[in-house]
Each structure stands twice: as structure tokens, then as C-alpha cells.
């Protein structure tokens, strides 16, 4: 039951993020990007990201307790989101700057968790588990870099494919 609940929570967060993204205009009026809209975009993204991170922890950390997979998944997904967003936002002229703030500063920032990763790494080091610590460090840092690049590549491939993404 607990796993189903966390999956549902992640799905609801993703749906809410998609609905908010649909409301962002592709040709913003100057008045559209006000401090209150900026705060709202970042806050909503961060809230959804943090809830998704919590859900991933509930769903995945019990699978292999020596390595908190939920934290790893959160960091890797956040890196992918950043890569997709950088590639997409950089090629769509006139896209509201709120989109980037919502996705990168808010959603990916709330989803990724350097502090939790650091605490888990410290715990492994304190237990003398140097091999597991090195593996965890490599997975988080190397995996995040790889998924950021994969996110950017995804947008590039979608643009070239018959599926396409609107320019």
C-alpha cells in the first residue's frame, strides 16, 4: 500500500506540473513576468519537486537499504529535467522565462537533494564502507552529468524525428 501511495503521489505531482506548464504563454507580455509570478513559478515547482522526492524515497529506499535508491533516482531525474529544459528553452524564442524558473529552479531544485545525498554518503563513510561510498558518489555525480546530457540529447532527437517538438 505504501508503494502505491508514493507512486500515485509522484504521478499527481507530474500532472500538476504539466498543467502549470500549459498555462505559461509562449509569447509573454512584459507584465506577465512580475515578482509575484516568479515567486509562484519557483514555489510551485519546488513544492512539486519536493513531494516527488519524498514519494521516490518512500517507494524506492526500501528496495536496497544499503544504497538509498530513492535519493539517487531523485537526483538523476532532476538532472534529466534540467537537460531537457535547457535544450528546449534555448530553442524556443519567446517562451516565458517563468517556464525555466518553474522547471529548473523550482521542480529540479526541489527534486534534487544534495543535502540528503551528503548525509547518506557521510553515514556510509562513518561505517567504513569506502567501496559503497565511492560507488554512490560515482553514481550520483556521473549519473547526474550523463542524464543532463541525455535530456539535452532527447530534445535534439525529438526535434529531428518525425514526432517533432514545436519550434
Curated annotation (Swiss-Prot):
Keyword Manganese set for record = no
Its localization reads: Cell inner membrane
Does Transport appear among the keywords? yes
Q: Which GO terms describe its cellular component?
A: plasma membrane
Bilayer topology annotation: Multi-pass membrane protein
Any idea which GO molecular function terms this record carries?
Answer: fluoride channel activity; metal ion binding
How is this protein activated or inhibited? Na(+) is not transported, but it plays an essential structural role and its presence is essential for fluoride channel function.
Spell out where the chain crosses the membrane.
32-52, 69-89, 102-122, 137-157
A single GO BP term for this record reads: cellular detoxification of fluoride
**Pfam families registered for this protein in UniProt:** CRCB
Reading the lineage from the top rank, the first entry is: Bacteria
Binding locations of Na(+): 109, 112
What catalytic activity does the UniProt entry give for this protein?
fluoride(in) = fluoride(out)
**Family matches, as InterPro entries:** FluC
Question: What keywords tag this UniProt record?
Answer: Cell inner membrane, Cell membrane, Ion channel, Ion transport, Membrane, Metal-binding, Sodium, Transmembrane, Transmembrane helix, Transport
PANTHER family assigned to the protein according to its UniProt record, in alphabetical order: FLUORIDE EXPORT PROTEIN 1-RELATED
Biological function: Fluoride-specific ion channel. Important for reducing fluoride concentration in the cell, thus reducing its toxicity.
The family note in this entry says: Belongs to the fluoride channel Fluc/FEX (TC 1.A.43) family.
For this entry, the protein name equals: Fluoride-specific ion channel FluC
Per the UniProt record, the lineage of the source organism begins with: Bacteria, Pseudomonadati, Pseudomonadota, Gammaproteobacteria, Lysobacterales
Amino acid at each position: 500500500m505504501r508503494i502505491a501511495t508514493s507512486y500515485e503521489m509522484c504521478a499527481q505531482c507530474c500532472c500538476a506540473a504539466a498543467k502549470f506548464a500549459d498555462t505559461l504563454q509562449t509569447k509573454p507580455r512584459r507584465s506577465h513576468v512580475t515578482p509575484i509570478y516568479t515567486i509562484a513559478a519557483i514555489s510551485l515547482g519546488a513544492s512539486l519537486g519536493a513531494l516527488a522526492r519524498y514519494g521516490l524515497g518512500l517507494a524506492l529506499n526500501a528496495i536496497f537499504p544499503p544504497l538509498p535508491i530513492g535519493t539517487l533516482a531523485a537526483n538523476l531525474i532532476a538532472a534529466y529535467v534540467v537537460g531537457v529544459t535547457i535544450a528546449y528553452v534555448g530553442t524556443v524564442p519567446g517562451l516565458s522565462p517563468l517556464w525555466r524558473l518553474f522547471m529548473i529552479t523550482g521542480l529540479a531544485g526541489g527534486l534534487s537533494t544534495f543535502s540528503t545525498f551528503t548525509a547518506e554518503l557521510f553515514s556510509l563513510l562513518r561505517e567504513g564502507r569506502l567501496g559503497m561510498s565511492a560507488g554512490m558518489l560515482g553514481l550520483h555525480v556521473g549519473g547526474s552529468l550523463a542524464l543532463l546530457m541525455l535530456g539535452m540529447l532527447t530534445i535534439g532527437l525529438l526535434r529531428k524525428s518525425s514526432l517533432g517538438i514545436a519550434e
